[in-house]
Swiss-Prot record:
It comes from Arthroderma otae (strain ATCC MYA-4605 / CBS 113480) (Microsporum canis). It is found in: Nucleus, Nucleolus. This is rRNA biogenesis protein RRP36. Residues 34-43, 119-128 have a biased composition (Acidic residues). InterPro entries: RRP36. Residues 1-43, 62-90, 103-191, 258-299, 329-365 are annotated as: Disordered. Residues 20-30 have a biased composition (Low complexity).
């Protein structure tokens, strides 16, 4: 009896059946009022419903490993236990079996013991149901996750739209100047046009013929290089006829400007005339400075020869400019001198105003 309790354990799904068998056996014992042998016999019949399975099924229900030949050989105690189980099973009477059957009640129609194949099919169905439930729960979780992602994207899109508007407002505020005198802020980025300009004759700079004797590179030499130097009086004297040519060309351009009717042509002629006048004034100013410098050198040499000076005094650039300006105003007429002085005064005042600090400039302005 003790060996049966140790080796044979009912599965979880048969717990209810075990409870029913125990309760029915107790009722039968109390009703019969038998002796101790009868009580023992009834107690033994409690485990009878679970002994209708064969040995392999009992081992599978109890989750025990199958008993092999090696196990029987290695464990003689287990062999003796099995012999005891077989002897106890052979000693159970048919009356005890009938009592237990009556206590359990009649078997329902179609409630026969299920075969192992049917049990496996039911287990597979339960697994399929569990898989379908798992799949459904997984699909629900995926749908919920997609909904959250969609909401997050919508919120992000709305925030990005607001941020773009704010950035545009900040950019517009930055572009506005603090003062009308401040330079305008303009981005250096610009869209590159897909249209490409093909190099043609109009866009190519025309090669101008030049005379190396009057080239600026040649004329920029120091005073030691006499040939080609702008301070060389011999070169200025030899090419003095070029000034007459320039004056004649200037008169022709002024006549063309007077007769021209096209606005573009007029603008081009005006630009050329202004450039020639500026060059003429620059040449006159240079000739004036050259004459002043030559006079100063001649005077210093005479003083040294007379013994009034031991060393020559070289004229500075600032003093040279002052002497040239003085000689310029002396050669002018009264009206021209007045206009020139007024123009000079405005130029100096504008220059001083630019160099003045901003606070003082605003007060005086």
């Amino acid at each position: 009896m003790s060996l049966l309790g140790k080796r044979i354990r009912a599965p979880r799904e048969d717990d209810d059946l075990l409870d029913e068998g125990l309760s029915s056996s107790e009722e039968l014992n109390s009703a019969s009022g038998g002796d101790e042998d009868g009580e023992l016999e009834d107690a033994e019949t409690v485990r009878v419903p679970f002994l209708i399975y064969d040995d392999k099924e009992l081992l599978e229900i109890a989750d025990l490993p199958p008993i092999g030949q090696s196990d029987l050989e290695d464990s003689p105690s287990e062999k003796e236990g099995e012999n005891d189980i077989e002897s106890s099973l052979s000693q159970i009477s048919f009356g005890a079996l009938a009592k237990v059957q009556r206590s359990l009640g009649p078997l329902k129609k179609g409630s026969k013991r299920k075969h192992r194949g049917q049990e496996e099919e039911e287990e597979e169905e339960e697994q399929d149901n569990g898989n379908t439930k798992y799949k459904k729960s997984k699909l629900d979780a995926l749908n919920e996750l997609r909904e959250r992602i969609r909401r997050a994207k919508e919120g992000k899109a709305s925030k990005s739209g607001q941020s773009k508007d704010e950035e545009a407002a900040v950019k517009k505020q930055k572009e506005s100047r603090l003062s009308k005198h401040a330079p305008a802020i303009q981005s250096s980025k610009f869209a590159v046009s897909r249209r490409r300009v093909v190099v043609d004759g109009e866009n190519v700079a025309q090669v101008k013929s030049r005379d190396p004797r009057f080239d600026s590179a040649v004329q920029s030499y120091s005073h030691s290089h006499r040939l080609g130097s702008h301070s060389d009086p011999a070169a200025a004297k030899n090419y003095a006829f070029l000034n007459d040519y320039r004056d004649a060309e200037l008169k022709e351009l002024e006549e063309k400007l007077r007769r021209a009717k096209n606005e573009d042509e007029k603008q081009q002629l005006k630009k050329t005339i202004t450039s020639m006048n500026d060059r003429k004034r620059a040449l006159e100013h240079r000739d004036r400075e050259r004459q002043i410098l030559s006079k100063h050198r001649k005077r210093e040499r005479e003083l040294i020869k007379e013994g009034k000076k031991e060393k020559a005094w070289f004229l500075k650039k600032a003093d040279l400019k002052k002497e040239a300006l003085k000689e310029k105003y002396e050669s002018m007429g009264a009206k021209q001198r007045q206009k020139g002085i007024e123009r000079r005064r405005k130029k100096v005042a504008s220059k001083e105003k630019k160099e003045m600090p901003r606070s003082r400039r605003m007060v005086e302005g």
